[in-house]
Amino acid sequence: MATLPITKRGAEKLKAELHNLKTVQRPWVINAISEARAQGDLSENAEYEVAKDRQGFIEGRIQEIEGKLSAAQVIDPTTFETGTRVVFGSTVKLEDEATGDSVTYQIVGEDEADIKLGLVNIGSPIARALIGKDEGDSAEVQAPGGIRRYEIVTVLYI
């Protein structure tokens, strides 16, 4: 499996989810299966089927998270030397050159991305356009409405 970049905050979030799945969700579903079995005939036992489906989901998610964490390259942007270059984990303030509107994004791994929170996937068009550029540079981004040009106003490692 290839190395997956993830921020320290993203890795901590995955570890917390894994802990919850193993210590809360898994024991709960095992108990639910046990209670459903105690009701007798399993062929028409909806509670049993639901619990078994839930168990399959939980076990699959545990394996998925463990795989991601084992392949993760955890990057803590607060440890970067002060600079002006856009890299994975950096927070970038942009200004739309056409409208003057400002927007701030942090470049994160795919599991962390949430555009509503300003977290953009390293593989997204905007992140690919920004990586390697410096404060004061312009970046062209292919957006659904056409090409947009942004000026990189500030780069922070927070």
Curated annotation (Swiss-Prot):
<dbReference type="Pfam" id="PF03449">
    <property type="entry name" value="GreA_GreB_N"/>
</dbReference>
<keyword id="KW-0238">DNA-binding</keyword>
<dbReference type="InterPro" id="IPR006359">
    <property type="entry name" value="Tscrpt_elong_fac_GreA"/>
</dbReference>
<dbReference type="InterPro" id="IPR036953">
    <property type="entry name" value="GreA/GreB_C_sf"/>
</dbReference>
<dbReference type="GO" id="GO:0006354">
    <property type="term" value="P:DNA-templated transcription elongation"/>
</dbReference>
<dbReference type="GO" id="GO:0032784">
    <property type="term" value="P:regulation of DNA-templated transcription elongation"/>
</dbReference>
<dbReference type="InterPro" id="IPR023459">
    <property type="entry name" value="Tscrpt_elong_fac_GreA/B_fam"/>
</dbReference>
<dbReference type="InterPro" id="IPR036805">
    <property type="entry name" value="Tscrpt_elong_fac_GreA/B_N_sf"/>
</dbReference>
<keyword id="KW-0805">Transcription regulation</keyword>
<dbReference type="InterPro" id="IPR028624">
    <property type="entry name" value="Tscrpt_elong_fac_GreA/B"/>
</dbReference>
<keyword id="KW-0804">Transcription</keyword>
<dbReference type="InterPro" id="IPR022691">
    <property type="entry name" value="Tscrpt_elong_fac_GreA/B_N"/>
</dbReference>
<dbReference type="GO" id="GO:0003677">
    <property type="term" value="F:DNA binding"/>
</dbReference>
<dbReference type="InterPro" id="IPR001437">
    <property type="entry name" value="Tscrpt_elong_fac_GreA/B_C"/>
</dbReference>
<protein>
    <recommendedName>
        <fullName>Transcription elongation factor GreA</fullName>
    </recommendedName>
</protein>
<comment type="similarity">
    <text>Belongs to the GreA/GreB family.</text>
</comment>
<dbReference type="Pfam" id="PF01272">
    <property type="entry name" value="GreA_GreB"/>
</dbReference>
<dbReference type="GO" id="GO:0070063">
    <property type="term" value="F:RNA polymerase binding"/>
</dbReference>
<comment type="function">
    <text>Necessary for efficient RNA polymerase transcription elongation past template-encoded arresting sites. The arresting sites in DNA have the property of trapping a certain fraction of elongating RNA polymerases that pass through, resulting in locked ternary complexes. Cleavage of the nascent transcript by cleavage factors such as GreA or GreB allows the resumption of elongation from the new 3'terminus. GreA releases sequences of 2 to 3 nucleotides.</text>
</comment>
<dbReference type="InterPro" id="IPR018151">
    <property type="entry name" value="TF_GreA/GreB_CS"/>
</dbReference>
